């Protein structure tokens, strides 16, 4: 099956897409994850870790396709795959920044004993 390694919630959402679109979406998701993980070797995300961010990205792309269709522009998943890639990468960067802030907050928080002044 095309989506067997994908988390359940993401798989359920993706089942609404045409098979050809699924192939494109799967390729873009895996490329985005690989690209992100290779740039941030200190943090390695699995699909399960980034499922919500991928869903947000897919919904954003679906809305963009719809909005452009209303304006008379014919867009497809194939024509929007660059937008999908950049949207997923943006969501992952946002998640990474939040994770780094959380780590640093606990590490350098003077109220939890994280900072030693001696």
Residue ranges and their predicted role:
Residues 1-118:
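Electrostatic interaction modules used in gene-expression and signaling proteins
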């Amino acid at each position: 099956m095309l989506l067997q390694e994908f988390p359940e919630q993401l798989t359920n959402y993706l089942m609404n897409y045409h098979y050809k679109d699924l192939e494109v979406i799967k390729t873009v998701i895996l490329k985005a994850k690989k690209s992100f993980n290779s740039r941030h070797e200190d943090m390695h995300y699995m699909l399960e870790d980034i499922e919500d961010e991928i869903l947000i990205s897919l919904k954003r792309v679906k809305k963009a396709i719809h909005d452009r269709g209303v304006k008379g522009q014919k867009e497809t998943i194939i024509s929007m795959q660059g937008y999908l890639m950049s949207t997923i990468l943006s969501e992952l960067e946002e998640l990474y920044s939040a994770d780094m802030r959380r780590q640093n907050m606990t590490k350098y928080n003077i109220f939890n004993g994280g900072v030693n002044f001696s």
